[in-house]
UniProtKB/Swiss-Prot annotation:
Coiled-coil ranges from the UniProt annotation: none
CC terms in the record's Gene Ontology section: cytosol
Site (Important for catalytic activity): 218
Organism: Pseudomonas entomophila (strain L48)
Protein name as catalogued: Adenine deaminase
Function: Catalyzes the hydrolytic deamination of adenine to hypoxanthine. Plays an important role in the purine salvage pathway and in nitrogen catabolism.
Requisite cofactors: Zn(2+)
Residues engaged in binding substrate: 276
GO MF: adenine deaminase activity; zinc ion binding
Residues annotated as binding Zn(2+): 14, 16, 194, 275
Family that this chain belongs to: Belongs to the metallo-dependent hydrolases superfamily. Adenosine and AMP deaminases family. Adenine deaminase type 2 subfamily.
Length: 316
């Protein structure tokens, strides 16, 4: 079944480039940039990948991202991910990147963007992988900070397909960013947002009604609100669900409790994604395989999930 799932043509719509930084590349970049790391070796770092919640993961995620300094670093990060896409027959990807993670530590916006966009261009030309880049605002920072990031992005408007919203969800509702999303839409950006991962269903309502999103990232807690579920079904709002991430961060205690197939069978346009694959133990195929192993996903369900991902693309 793994080989069949791997060969299935699919798109990935929820993947943070910084979260694809494998320990081996992290150590290589640290050496290249002469950065001292707090971990003795790759295995020690892998051993640190045990999280009780989203915040514990984010603390390590931001620490790891510190090795990304040059345009070449961002190219190598993105290219390594695209090679994984090719190996797993991901024919289209719409990754996130978090400019504030880098600009806040003095890395120029254009350095970050230059490496990523060149790799995506090479991915299209050399690997045949379609792509669209999503600029994500960090929700634990202020809306004013997000506005500054949008200012930095506007000279490179054509490099992006959408803006998004990620990082610590609790206490940072989508409504906090309504003005910057309004402005982004007026500049021609599409919009997506993380909601309903650790945050309540109310955050999903806000993302739909206030941020006017094209897709909900995560959204698994929608199932707690029947009226919300009906709206998502009626309007066919896609959910970019990340099963291994959800279990690794204790959104669900065990994969056998995950609700993705329940949502699929109720008519929700759910998709399968890896979120931060280097930290959560798998890329897209591994996420599909976990659903097969623990939830008994059928080939028909896998086909529908893969087709949903292709249908929910922002870039055609």
């Amino acid at each position: 079944m793994y080989e069949w799932l791997n060969a299935l043509p699919k798109a990935e719509l929820h993947m943070h480039l910084e979260g694809s930084l494998e320990p081996e590349l992290l150590f290589a970049l640290a050496e290249r940039n002469k950065i001292a790391l707090p971990w003795a070796d790759v295995e020690t770092l892998r051993g640190a990948y045990a999280f009780n919640n989203l915040q514990e993961f984010l603390d390590l995620y931001y620490q790891g991202a510190d090795v990304l300094r040059t345009e070449q670093d961002f190219y190598d990060l993105t290219w390594a991910y695209l090679q994984r896409c090719k190996a797993q027959n991901v024919i289209h990807t719409e990754p996130f990147f978090d400019p504030q993670t880098h600009t806040d530590r003095g890395i120029p916006f254009e350095v970050v963007l230059g490496g990523i966009t060149q790799a995506l261009k090479d991915g299209r030309e050399q690997l045949g992988i379609g792509s669209g880049l999503i600029l994500s605002f960090l929700r634990h920072l202020s809306e004013d900070e997000a506005q500054k990031t949008l200012d930095q992005a506007l000279p490179f408007r054509d490099a992006f397909v959408a803006v998004g919203l990620d990082s610590s969800e609790k206490g940072h509702p989508p409504s906090k960013f309504q003005r910057v999303f309004d402005r982004a839409r007026s500049e021609g950006f599409l919009t997506v947002a993380h909601a309903g991962e650790e945050g309540p269903p109310e955050y999903i309502w806000e993302a739909i009604d206030l941020l006017k999103i094209q897709r909900i990232d995560h959204g698994v807690r929608a199932i707690e609100d029947e009226r919300l579920m009906q709206r998502i079904i009626d309007e066919q709002i896609p959910l970019t669900v990340c099963p291994l991430s959800n279990t690794k961060l204790c959104v669900f205690e065990h994969m056998s409790q995950h609700n993705i197939l329940d949502m699929l069978e109720r008519g929700v346009k759910v998709t399968v994604n890896s979120d931060d694959p280097a930290y959560f133990g798998g890329y897209v195929t591994e996420n599909f395989h976990a659903l097969y192993e623990h939830l008994g996903m059928t080939q028909d369900q896998a086909r529908r999930l893969a087709q949903n991902s292709l249908d929910a693309r922002l870039v055609r």
